[in-house]
Swiss-Prot record:
Lineage: Eukaryota, Metazoa, Chordata, Craniata, Vertebrata
Gene: dnaaf10
Source organism: Xenopus laevis (African clawed frog)
PANTHER family the record matches: MRNA EXPORT FACTOR AND BUB3 (PTHR10971)
Pfam families named among the record's database cross-references: WD40 (PF00400)
Protein name, per record: Dynein axonemal assembly factor 10
Subcellular location: Dynein axonemal particle
Ranges for the WD repeats: 64-106, 116-155, 163-206, 208-250, 258-298, 320-358
Length: 358
């Protein structure tokens, strides 16, 4: 990829200004539609559905909600229903039928404080086993919900009595390669990363990356854990090789100083798990490719398997805004199509070219 023209290009296809603070955006599976959620100036929440039509984002519907909506996922919904699960500033977990979004089809008082982050698995053809939703909150707890079970979570990971409650900023499902196995990874404001094994309800691994963890994502949710990317406040991200866990050293990792400011999000390309995008606090996007080492594990001096980290190379970067890009979502259906939101109250649909050449 010597010539600049051979590199992937990041093209702003559609820009749409809105009159509220945008917190999250998600493509609606199997459609040219996406949903945006956020906070109106008067303190209520808003849920909007847009459709791409002739190079424009056309607003199809808008619904106001009592509390600002912080995050959303389709990950626990079937392809037929495509229900959106959201977390709001009041600690409520709601599931919405976007065809009739006035009242939720499921509602639970999930947390005592704001739900910062949400993820889903077991739906939209991703991950074996039951559909589940995980939420993380400022109240320090991480809870796993089965949308078929009302009111009570199926798992609750909270600090032990006497331990300080840390603000949970990001959660991610992974390792859902059969009906029994499933893991949740959570990142906290003090730099802690904790990997919870949901099958035997234990903390499988924990580490600290010294700065608040803004975003976590496995490269795939529905395979044996392969890679995990964690982004942080000080412009760094870390890629952990999750295939080999050393008893004392944990997982091997490589870190990159990606941005000059907070790395708000990381999102892997659904069609190629070694390509991922990071979004920054200065309104920029960086597209990366992970290169594996010649050998992913080796024996240490005691003869124990230890992981070997690879490297991340920058493919392209672009500045779209002066404000942080707070959310980003790749289209699961159309390779290279993505939607992102920024605190400049603009939602942008982007096209990333030449991804099939990587």
């Amino acid at each position: 990829m010597s010539s600049p023209l051979e590199k992937p290009q990041i093209i702003a296809h559609v820009q749409k200004s809105v009159n509220y603070t945008l917190f999250d955006c998600k493509w609606i599976p199997c459609s040219a539609k996406f949903v945006c959620v956020g906070n109106l100036a008067r303190g209520s929440g808003v849920l909007q559905v847009y459709e791409i039509q002739q190079g424009e984002a056309k607003l199809l519907q808008e619904t106001e909600k009592p509390k600002p909506i912080k995050c959303g996922t389709f990950g626990a919904s079937s392809m037929q229903q495509r229900y959106l699960a959201t977390g709001d500033f009041g600690g409520n977990l709601n599931i919405w039928n976007l065809e009739a979004p006035d009242t939720p089809v499921y509602s639970a008082k999930g947390h005592n404080e704001i739900i910062n982050c949400i993820d889903g698995v077991g739906g939209v053809g991703i991950g074996d086993g039951a559909p589940e939703i995980v939420t993380g909150s400022r109240d320090g707890t991480v809870k796993v919900w089965d949308p078929r079970q009302k009111d009570t979570p199926v798992a609750n990971m909270e600090p032990a009595a006497g331990e300080a409650k840390r603000d949970c900023w990001t959660v991610a499902f992974g390792n859902a390669y059969n009906e029994q196995e499933r893991a949740v990874c959570a990142g906290y404001d003090n730099g802690d990363i904790k990997l919870f094994d949901l099958r035997n309800m234990s903390v499988r691994w924990e580490t600290n990356i010294k700065n608040g963890v803004c975003s976590l994502e496995f490269d795939r949710k529905d395979i044996v854990m392969n890679k995990l990317v964690a982004t942080s406040l000080e412009g760094k991200f870390h890629v952990f090789d999750m295939r080999t866990q050393h008893p004392t050293k944990g997982f091997a990792s490589v870190s990159e100083k990606a941005h000059k400011s907070t790395v708000w999000q990381v999102r892997h390309l659904p069609q190629n798990r070694d390509v991922f995008m990071t979004s920054g606090g200065a309104g920029n996007l960086h597209l990366w490719k992970y290169e594996y080492p010649a050998q992913r594990s080796r024996k240490d001096s005691d003869g124990v398997d230890t992981g070997v980290a690879g490297s991340a190379s920058l493919l392209q970067n672009v500045t779209l805004s002066t404000q942080p890009i707070s959310s980003l979502d790749w289209s699961p259906d159309k390779k290279g199509l993505c939607v992102c939101t920024s605190f400049d109250q603009t939602v942008r649909v982007l096209i990333v070219t030449k991804l099939n050449r990587l």
